[in-house]
Amino acid sequence: MNQILVTEKLYITPELKRKKKIYKFYFILSVFIVLILTSFYIYAEYDRNKSAEVSQQLLDDMNKTLEGTTEDTTIAQDDVLLVVLNGTKEETQQEEQQNQQEQQSMVTTANEKAEWKTSAAGYKYKIIATVEVPKISLKYTVVQGQSGSIEETESLLKSSPVKYHGYDPNEVGNFCIVGHNYRNSKFFSKVPNLTVGDTVKLTDLTGRTINYEVYDKHTVDPSDTKDTTQLTGGRKELTLITCTDDSKLRVIVRCKEVK
């Protein structure tokens, strides 16, 4: 009996005690790391949901801004239609050109009058358009920062797609919009799924909506900015920009106005 007890005691050596302490330390460390990672995940989800709420509020604000503007835009389009029916080809072209200039002036004026808001991070911005892609159930406002700095853009991207480059929305040139890829259904996460022929709608502050058609999609290095060129041959174009799922490249979706 005593021999058995002695034998059992021999198994609990200093080395075994040391290993048990090490295992216990690693176990506690693992639990701590899991808790930290879980906390980061919960915070990230909270931050994304909060951003989605802000984005929805921006969309509601845009809808309020557009109230009462649709009628004026429709009248302008009807005037063009009357010219087509009653005027000569040359007169029609002149009237269409004049109408485009008036419309551009209206957009510029509306953008200048747009209310500047302040983000939670203290950056100034204003809503300038709404972008909608029916295929992927995407509809968000497009905001423009006051300074256009990288820090400002990165901050505003948490709440909305942001104007990256170009003239006013729905005007001749290449209107570029950048949006986050959260690898879910929020913001531009599904933009990489678009294909040639898909429709993208852009509504400016006058209430005018223009349909654009995807004609090219490709990826580039983050430093490659050739797709933001304003040389469009007199066409109205729209470019959507987001990152790939691994964030190593940028997804570029080029669109042109549907006439």
Q: Residue spans of the language-model regions?
A:
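N-terminal Lys/Arg-rich, disordered targeting/topogenic segments
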Residues: 1-22
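Solvent-exposed, non-transmembrane regions of membrane-associated and secreted proteins
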Residues: 15, 19-259
